[in-house]
Amino acid sequence: MKSHGIVHKYGDNVDTDVIIPARYLNSSDPKELAKKCMEDIDKEFVNRVNLGDIMVANKNFGCGSSREHAPIAIKASGISCVIAETFARIFYRNAINIGLPIIECKEAARDIDAGNEVEIDFDSGIITNLTKGTSYQGQAFPEFMQKIMKADGLINYINEQLEAV
């Protein structure tokens, strides 16, 4: 599984309250959440993002309130992957559960700039910055998590397993 796109870059401690503000949590419709994604930190995000783009951040991405609305909003906005130095653990699990690929890599998170063209190979964990001609070794998903991601989330994965029985 691979992702390829243009980078949208953010700093440390991007919390779920700025990914999708609480005032929009009355909806669970991914399309509606996508329209408000990153609104409090980057007003132009929804106008700039294209299908397949990649979000890069520094430390503790997805901290704050536990809400699956945050990874849903990011995924529905068109982002194909989030790269960060570290993720808040609850965000990490929520992202996997809804099928949003994420990968931890300190060097990539620090070196990749907004606007760079990046490709990620999730099977190997290799992140390639096509703009700068550099590669980084990120943390590859364990096999069971790769299966969840390929199924586009935990619920789809479980349904596939049930259908196979």
Curated annotation (Swiss-Prot):
Catalytic activity, reaction form: (2R,3S)-3-isopropylmalate = (2S)-2-isopropylmalate
Primary enzyme class: lyase
Sorted UniProt keywords: Amino-acid biosynthesis, Branched-chain amino acid biosynthesis, Leucine biosynthesis, Lyase
Tree of life domain: Bacteria
Residues spanning the signal sequence: none
The protein's annotated pathway: Amino-acid biosynthesis; L-leucine biosynthesis; L-leucine from 3-methyl-2-oxobutanoate: step 2/4
InterPro entries registered for this protein in UniProt: Aconitase/3IPM_dehydase_swvl, AconitaseA/IPMdHydase_ssu_swvl, IPMI_Swivel, LeuD, LeuD/DmdB_bac, LeuD_type2/HacB/DmdB
EC number(s) given by UniProt: 4.2.1.33
GO biological process: L-leucine biosynthetic process
Alphabetized GO MF terms: 3-isopropylmalate dehydratase activity
Pfam families: Aconitase_C (PF00694)
PANTHER family named among the record's database cross-references: 3-ISOPROPYLMALATE DEHYDRATASE SMALL SUBUNIT 1, 3-ISOPROPYLMALATE DEHYDRATASE SMALL SUBUNIT 2-RELATED-RELATED
Subunit description: Heterodimer of LeuC and LeuD.
Family named by the database record: Belongs to the LeuD family. LeuD type 2 subfamily.
Protein task: Catalyzes the isomerization between 2-isopropylmalate and 3-isopropylmalate, via the formation of 2-isopropylmaleate.
Protein name, entry field: 3-isopropylmalate dehydratase small subunit
Species in which this protein is naturally found: Lachnoclostridium phytofermentans (strain ATCC 700394 / DSM 18823 / ISDg) (Clostridium phytofermentans)
